[in-house]
């Protein structure tokens, strides 16, 4: 990983650097405006943090991302095996119980929150389909990565063009 910001708010992955049309990063707890137990750069609105602080952190994150219009898509993860395809109609709906997101639409930032779980990022370099997966032990046992690849397969991804991180 390498620092993408001097204040350590964002760390990047070298593996996906070869694909300039996507951004692949992790945020840290540094530099946010949340207070108390959430004194961090918390962008997850499902954990009990103040909505105003979460929204300010999300705006800060948007300002750090390349591109003029970035829509953050942040699901309410429940350690499930549920995969959701994000399109223009669904992006504004609540994403309850979703632990993996898939889209081929530019301008969406698919987000997953992790602590001791593993973020898995998939990208088809030909079809430009991307997935972000929250793989905790329950999701892993339920084969969430395999199920996400199956959903991507419905969008005609090519396994030879699929990259994973």
Where are these regions (language model features)?
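Active-site microenvironment for binding and transforming phosphate-containing groups
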Residues: 1-165
